Amino acid sequence: MTEPAAHFASHAAAARTLRIWDISPPLDERSEVFPGDTAYSQELHFSLSPGCPVNVNRITLSPHTGAHADAPLHYASGEAAIGAVDLQPYLGPCRVIHCLDCGPLVEPAHIAHALENLPPRVLLRTSRTASQSWASFTAIAPATLALLATKNIVLIGIDTPSVDPAASQNLPSHQQLLRHGLRVLENLVLDDVPEGDYELIALPLKLMRADASPVRAILRELS
């Protein structure tokens, strides 16, 4: 191959569009929240008219609606709000691990097959079709988070509403997150994502006093 042709081929390869997976559920009035939490609502605050050149919505929602990032403040008073946390955990190489039909908790044995050369972020796919329902879902065993912490991960994500069961009062898995300084994403949609390694982009909003933030989470193929 001549030098100009080689340069063109290299440039074409670099310019190839990498595939993106949108792993966020839609946000609207059908979005489920923890029983008693603030439901999503939306209305027009300003409306296009002869005296108004724009539409502007007013939106009310819990910061735990849809795909979201919990801040340490969510499970420990005096800890950091979501607008104060480091953004680095929410951006970079990650691994999607399939632990389908594993029951009420993701145990260490369910992820043991995928721990070699682990990148710093792990997303767990527990169901064939993600659901935001609080009625029944898979959470993460504290022992699983403790194991992942030994692998030097910085973030864990899951395709269910919470890393703890809905009825939990002491939130042992959230406490493991706090103990090991791990960040967390909940309510992801991993239905169409093969097991493997990706780039994660899921930045929270800079909400300076909030205990969580919605994210628009995506995965991008590495090459």
Swiss-Prot record:
InterPro entries: KFase/CYL, KFase_sf, Kynurenine_formamidase_bac. Substrate binds at F34. The active site is at H74 (proton donor/acceptor). SUPFAM superfamilies: Putative cyclase. It comes from the Bacteria. Its cofactor is Zn(2+). Gene3D superfamilies: Putative cyclase. Pathway: Amino-acid degradation; L-tryptophan degradation via kynurenine pathway; L-kynurenine from L-tryptophan: step 2/2. Belongs to the Cyclase 1 superfamily. KynB family. Homodimer. This is Kynurenine formamidase. It comes from Polaromonas naphthalenivorans (strain CJ2). The gene is kynB.
